[in-house]
Amino acid sequence: MNWEVEYLPEAESDLKSLDGSQRILVLKAIKKVKQYPLPIFEGGYGKPLGNKNGNDLSGFLKVKLKSAGLRVVYKVVKQNDKMLIIVIGARADEEVYGIAQKRIQENDL
């Protein structure tokens, strides 16, 4: 089953700001993950996030694109079979997680 993918407007901007090869990698990863975006402990592809370095991302998941050094942070909305993309960005010094925390607060997620 494919879940619906929805992006925060800021995440759409993140995707557009990537270079062409990075964008292709991210879209391929999202296409794969949307088949089963649940956490790995439920048999899905998402790695659960928690409360670390002042960023409480409990209930959110990530997908790592190691070769590109990118992360995709998202939330699963089970009642709507939806995968909500919060941020797409470089792993650099946990910065992507700080951005995710800010967007979660701004959007009351």
Where are these regions (language model features)?
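A structure-centric signal for secondary-structure junctions around beta-strands
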Residues: 2, 27, 57, 80-82
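A broad, low-specificity signal marking well-ordered, structured residues that form hydrophobic/aromatic
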Residues: 5, 61, 83
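Non-catalytic, surface-exposed connector residues within folded enzymatic/regulatory domains
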Residues: 5, 42-43, 98
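A short, surface-exposed loop/turn module that caps and links secondary-structure elements
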Residues: 35-64
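A short beta-strand-loop micro-motif that forms or neighbors metal/cofactor-
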Residues: 23, 30-38, 80
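Residue-level marker for the onset of beta-strands and adjacent loop->beta junctions
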Residues: 1, 59, 70-72
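Arg/Lys-rich, positively charged N-terminal/basic patches that mediate binding to nucleic acids
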Residues: 1-31
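Enriched for short, Lys/Arg-rich terminal
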Residues: 13, 64-109
